[in-house]
């Protein structure tokens, strides 16, 4: 991995370049140029410069890119190509770790006799992750396994990347429409220590594998062995959801059934896991999911999970029920009493109604077709500073226990839009979110 100082030097070049472009753009406007055209040109060039530099980074930037990947569907068409190119670079495979380093990490983590635990070990990496790479191997009992090995120095490099990226949240947000960058980076930073210790991921994965053991629609590979910087799990062969998204763009007519099934399964997995496992899978990006040949959805990364031992909070279901029935006066009272309104701020139920309506389409029908155009429209309204609803949004907040829930919900919806899929959203809500059915019946 590159040294942190090299990363910081590259990132330090960005503000000067963007500031220079802004000055030129301001001068052109003073000279009578078209404001919209000049602003679009400025944003395009700023985006290209920012993405070009971030695309060279790994670690924190790669994790950041994975988090942003679910927002791709919300980006306006004029930014779509540079945004997708940037995501490709941010998530691209890192240069492979020298095999001597891989063996050294295995010596340190599994003991110098680690080779006796494997019948065979492929020295060529099968895949790369943000802080490590995966090798295919055969365990001593004959099982095919995936061996995830953390890059030496990944912890220091990741912390350095995230510290620098956190200083750039405003700049990044200005060229990525619809992306609420600051909380994304805050979450990644907060969970860095957990994700750097693969024993935490192993514990999460064991819980999910137990909860979904024998499930007809989902499969979680079992953990075979674990250490702080090495994780060995069962190997699964399947088609990544990221590949299905791409295939759907190339052949929309021939993939409708598959895309709808994938989106429905991902929705069911995220909605059901707090009840089944007591945890929420908190890293919803397409690279963490695969469709197997038998039609089951496989989930293969559990580095980020949020504990929900009692399932989703019933208040969530109550809020959705009130929004469905447009009982915004009661919803506003509920939001005040449970900390969704910043203390000292005043919001009317009419303002809440106007603010929430663009987001409530998926809960108005039994089944909803998520598309890029819908996501773009919603994101556009949410970030249009000329709209009074944006001012309303500035008076709202997410209580800490809801931050990860809404992050996962937003990520799942983003993937559904990328899949251009129809999902029985309300049925999932009724089946798995407590408070929804009861509150509607009570109302």
Give a label for each model feature.
Residues 276-286:
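Catalytic-loop of the protein kinase fold
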Residues 1-273, 278, 291-298, 302-310, ...:
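Broad phosphate/nucleotide-binding scaffolds in NTP-utilizing and phosphate-metabolizing enzymes
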Residues 315-318:
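Short amphipathic alpha-helical recognition elements used for nucleic-acid or partner binding
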């Amino acid at each position: 991995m590159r040294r942190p100082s090299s990363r910081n030097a590259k990132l330090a070049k960005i503000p000067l370049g963007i500031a220079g472009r802004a000055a030129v753009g301001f001068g052109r406007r003073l000279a009578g140029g078209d404001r919209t055209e000049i602003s679009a040109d400025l944003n395009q060039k700023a985006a290209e410069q920012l993405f070009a530099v971030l695309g060279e980074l790994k670690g924190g930037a790669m994790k950041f890119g994975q988090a942003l990947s679910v927002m791709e569907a919300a980006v306006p068409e004029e930014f779509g190509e540079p945004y997708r190119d940037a995501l490709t670079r941010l998530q691209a495979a890192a240069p492979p770790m020298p095999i001597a380093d891989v063996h050294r990490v295995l010596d340190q983590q599994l003991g110098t006799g680690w080779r006796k635990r494997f019948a065979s070990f492929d020295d060529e990496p099968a895949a790369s992750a943000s802080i490590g790479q995966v090798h295919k191997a055969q365990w001593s009992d004959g099982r095919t396994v995936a061996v995830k090995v953390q890059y030496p120095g990944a912890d220091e490099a990741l912390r350095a990347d995230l510290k620098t990226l956190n200083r750039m949240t405003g700049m990044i947000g200005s060229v990525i429409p619809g992306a609420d960058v600051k909380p994304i980076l805050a979450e990644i930073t907060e969970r860095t220590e957990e994700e750097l210790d693969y024993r935490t991921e192993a514990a999460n994965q064991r819980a999910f594998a137990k909860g979904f053991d024998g499930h007809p629609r989902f499969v979680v590979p079992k953990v075979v062995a674990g250490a702080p910087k090495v994780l060995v799990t069962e190997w699964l062969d399947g088609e990544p959801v990221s590949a299905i998204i791409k295939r759907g763009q190339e052949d929309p007519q021939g993939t409708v059934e598959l895309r709808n099934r994938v989106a429905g399964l991902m929705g069911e997995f995220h909605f059901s896991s707090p009840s089944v496992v007591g945890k929420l899978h908190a890293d919803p990006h397409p690279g963490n999911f695969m469709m197997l040949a038998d039609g089951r959805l496989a989930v293969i990364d559990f580095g980020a999970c949020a504990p929900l031992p009692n399932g989703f909070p019933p208040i969530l279901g109550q809020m959705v029920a009130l929004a469905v029935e447009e009982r915004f006066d009661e919803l506003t009272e509920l939001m005040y009493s449970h900390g969704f309104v910043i203390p000292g701020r005043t919001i009317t139920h009419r303002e809440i109604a106007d603010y929430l309506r663009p987001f409530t389409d998926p809960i108005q029908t039994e089944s909803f077709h998520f598309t890029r155009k819908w996501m773009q429209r919603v994101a556009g309204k949410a970030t249009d500073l000329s709209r009074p609803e944006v001012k309303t949004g500035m008076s709202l907040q997410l209580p800490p226990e809801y931050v990860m829930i809404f992050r996962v919900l937003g990520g799942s919806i983003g993937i559904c839009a990328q899949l251009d899929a129809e999902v029985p959203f309300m049925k999932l809500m009724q089946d798995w979110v407590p408070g929804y059915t009861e509150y509607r019946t009570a109302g």
